[in-house]
């Protein structure tokens, strides 16, 4: 018997399934690193899947720990490159971090190139609702944020005339 104790099924960590079966992933606001403006979960999932050896060489003790020094160094470097070169250039050319190079997007493969097709299929397009971006106590949030492999592409502030929200609000 179980002596009145409930038996809990084993919990398996699994990526959120694609949004509506169309290749979109649902991002979580808690995965958004406000200091660096990156969806860390989507970024690290992409890097682990496409460049596992380089990702391991980052030597993060715990990639989910925001205080891990190697995690901080990598995210700060990536954020600085985005600030300097822009997100499109970083997606196209990747980023250098010490001796390592990281590709951050895989473009449309040529026909018959199975390796490129496999890498392209690992790109992660995600949508995050209620994206808190302010670093202060106001906790201001955007209605939607769009990301490719954890890098921000677009934000949306949705308005509703039925609730008297307009572009001026």
Model segments located where?
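An alpha-helical interface "stripe"
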Residues: 1-169
């Amino acid at each position: 018997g179980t002596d009145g104790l409930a038996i809990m099924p084993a919990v398996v960590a699994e990526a959120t399934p694609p949004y509506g079966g169309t290749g979109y992933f649902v991002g979580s606001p808690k995965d958004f690193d406000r200091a660096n403006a990156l969806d860390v979960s989507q970024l690290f999932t992409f890097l682990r899947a496409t460049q596992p050896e380089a990702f391991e060489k980052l030597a993060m003790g715990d990639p989910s720990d925001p205080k891990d020094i190697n995690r901080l160094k990598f995210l700060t470097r990536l954020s600085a490159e985005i600030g300097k070169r822009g997100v499109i250039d970083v997606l196209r050319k990747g980023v250098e971090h010490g001796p390592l190079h990281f590709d951050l997007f895989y473009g449309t493969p040529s026909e018959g190139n199975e390796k490129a097709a496999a890498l392209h299929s690992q790109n992660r397009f995600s949508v995050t609702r209620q994206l808190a971006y302010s670093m202060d106590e106001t906790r201001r949030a955007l209605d939607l944020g769009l990301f490719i492999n954890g890098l921000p592409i677009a934000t949306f502030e949705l308005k509703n005339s039925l609730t008297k929200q307009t572009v001026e609000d």
